Amino acid sequence: MYYSAGTYESFAHPEKPKDVDKKSAYIIGTGLAGLTAAFYLVRDGQMKGEHIHVFEKLDLAGGSCDGRKDITKGFFMRGGREMDNHFEVMWDTFRDVPSIETPGISVLDEYYWLNKHDPNYSLCRASVNRGEDAHTDKQFKLDKDSAMALSKLFMTPEKDLEDKKISDVLPDSFWNTNFWLYWQTMFAFQRWSSALEMKRYLCRYVHHIDGLPDFSALRFTKYNQYESMILPLVKYLESHGVHIEYGMDVRNVIIETEGDKKVARQIVYVKDGREQTIDLIEDDLVFITNGCCTDTSCYGDQTHAPDLSGVKNGAGESWDMWKAVAAQAEHGEYGNPDAFCSDVDATNWMSATVATSNEEIIRHIMSICKRDPRSGKVTTGGIVTVKDSTDNWYLSWTINRQPQFKSQDKNMVLVWLYSLNTNREGNYVKKAMRDCTGEEVCREWLYHIGMPTEKIHALAHDACNTTTCFMPYINAFFQPRKESDRPKVVPDGAVNFAFIGQFAETPRDTIFTTEYSMRTGMESVYTLLDIDRGVPEVWGSKYDVREILRACYYAIDKKPISQAPLSFKEREMLKVLLKKVKGTDIELLLKESGLIK
């Protein structure tokens, strides 16, 4: 497997891999990583669909990319997906997955046209005082110490950031900047999250720094992620004969070390309450989704708080399977699940879905986001963060294009919200969010959008239906780590198995994204089948001096470098440097970026 960039490789069709007709594939998990692996086995590996078996414990494909309606409790959306135009593997996949809504076009075409006609951007990024615009005004408000620390982090080698927290590398003044408000709530980072992962994010999205304050860098699907992404991919695979088997609870993959080779020899699973096994030979390929950020999700509804009695450090079937596999490694080459699943107090947050058709509530929504949620177009354009809830729940909420579900009533609006501090009292509801019913969560949200307090209880009870989801491991992949804590997609010496998903290690890319999961799926197939076509590299904006200069301009709030907070000595040095580059292409680059006039 090798990486490539440019259209030469991306437009080419690889030759059929040697002996692929003799091989079979077993994919554990139907999240984006597993479905993408199946896709590349079919399209580029040219493996017969009937040779591909995808195992799923639940009765629905999609893993964490879900969205569903419970006929008794209402709509559930655990989370949303923010997409980037340089998710290279994602778009390489969806350019060949047919739309299930519009005949004759691909999912990529559908998505591309939608976001061209209805581009995303926010008109109110944060609120204060119960629905007033916080006027962050696209400013980062970085002080000199914070800006210098971010620059240093950008350039620090990953090895030097292993097992370090963000708070270990950034100054206290950073937490009061708009940059941190945008960053924390958009990506769900915490102060104790991995400094290494924050560095990856800075490098990966340096080309989007101008779109960070108002989400203009983002693109969204038309419906929820299940209906817009998972379902078309499942239908594509089924049309090629791929067999997806539900109710398959995989407990272990037995791996034997034979000299320099590592060979998967058996899959252990439970089906219909009975433990069974599948014996494997070297031509049987196994793709293991190790770990899951939504494992042990706890659901609540309008009248019930989520039941957290089963939540404890390390508990969860995906972790149990990974631990069973990791225990077979001689030198830790299958990763260290305990690095990610051993502190649920650090890795949890909670989301809720509010369904309402109430006109008064919708008017209050419109007064904040300045758009009609029933227009079918972008509404909030990303989350609205309640800035004065920082010391409480730290609530953010959003309304994507409506309807979010094809089965949704045309007058209904679905609101998604989440809290980073699930163990603190709310500003209005004097309980921790994790202890609240859906109705109580809705009261807190209604309070923050400015509903009259005397109406809040009645509206939350009669005019809204709210479902909730507490996720103990949703931030598990943000835990401080070292490189060896996540197994390589294909470990050294592995003959017929790979690790895929958010807890497999692939260079440069960022977790908590659709692209990361899909990239591991593509890389695993290309490696095990030795497909002779390049995997598109992670977009290289961190190596593009134009993007870096442009990022500097926006980081200092669109000021020329002469207005940056420089000391006398630094200003004198700047004068000398600018004189040296006068009349060169460097001067032109500085002018194009806005750093000099």
Where are these regions (language model features)?
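Amphipathic alpha-helical segments that form well-ordered structural scaffolds
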Residues: 89-96, 182, 228-239, 440-448, ...
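Helical element adjacent to the flavin cofactor pocket in flavoenzyme catalytic cores
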Residues: 203-285, 289-291, 303-304, 309-311, ...
